[in-house]
Amino acid sequence: MSLPSLDSVPVLRRGFRFQFEPAQDCHVLLYPEGMVKLNDSAGEILKLVDGRRDVAAIVAALRERFPEVPGIDEDILTFLEVAHAQFWIELQ
């Protein structure tokens, strides 16, 4: 695995849907074979994965929203790396 480049644009893979699930009280990724429960951090990142923003814009938006979180850049990049490896997202 390798960290995504800052100019790549993440997009949810076909067949995946991101939404808040009241019964689970969290954001989830739904796909034909099941569901992935996401923690709060993953939910905040995936809210910004819209197929238009590049990784740099996502990092900048979250850094601005959560300035008190140390190492947020690396956390975001690592999550996107894992999401890509799990085939939840594609990087364009």
UniProtKB/Swiss-Prot annotation:
It comes from the Bacteria. It holds the Pfam family PqqD. Gene3D superfamilies: Coenzyme PQQ synthesis protein D (PqqD) (1.10.10.1150). One of its GO terms (biological process) is pyrroloquinoline quinone biosynthetic process. Keywords: PQQ biosynthesis. InterPro entries: PQQD (IPR008792), PqqD_bac (IPR022479), PqqD_sf (IPR041881). Monomer. Interacts with PqqE. This is PqqA binding protein. The lineage of its organism: Bacteria, Pseudomonadati, Pseudomonadota, Gammaproteobacteria, Pseudomonadales.
